[in-house]
Regions:
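Extreme N-terminal starter segment of soluble prokaryotic enzymes
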Residues: 1-4
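Short, well-ordered coil/turn elements that cap or connect secondary structure elements
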Residues: 23, 80-82, 104-105
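Conserved beta-strand scaffold positions in the cores of enzyme catalytic domains, especially
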Residues: 23-28, 109
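A glycine- and Lys/Arg-enriched "phosphate-lid" helix/loop adjacent to the NTP-binding pocket
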Residues: 48-53, 98-137
């Protein structure tokens, strides 16, 4: 089964690519969902500051590949079920290294790119809890 990892700046359009993949029957694993789950598990508000603090705190404590490592079990289950899998939101070389070690050449990486102006406009429109405001962007 095909395995694609998306990467790109916030609001570049990764979610749109993931939505199209899902409409075509692909399983989508959004790495950010793990961060949201951990934030909620700790009893923290799903707000940009707390989500960011959890994400970065775990990276500092366990290494920058921590969220990719924690994704492997879910991705493996999706693949075992026979699904093509799209990984939404891979960040940085350490996460790529985790996925390359686990999946080798079966992993295809795709960068989604949009201008800063376009990304800011999307952030202001979509109102996602982890986006923050224009000043944070």
């Amino acid at each position: 089964m095909t395995l694609i990892a998306l990467t790109g700046m916030p609001a570049a359009g990764k979610g749109e690519v993931a939505a199209v993949a899902q409409q075509r029957g692909w399983a989508v694993h959004r790495i950010g969902d793990l961060v949201w789950e951990e934030t909620e598990r700790r009893g923290l508000e799903l707000a940009p500051a707390s989500v960011g603090a959890v994400a970065n705190g775990e990276r500092e404590a366990h290494g920058y590949g921590v969220w990719a490592s924690r994704s492997l079990e879910r991705i493996d289950a999706l693949r075992a079920a026979g699904s093509h899998v799209l990984i939404d939101g891979m960040r940085g070389e350490r996460e790529l290294a985790v996925f390359r070690t686990a999946y080798g050449d079966a992993l295809v990486t795709v960068a989604v790119v949009a201008s800063a102006e376009q990304r800011l406009a999307r952030v202001q429109q979509r109102g996602r809890i982890d986006d923050g405001d224009a000043a944070a962007f």
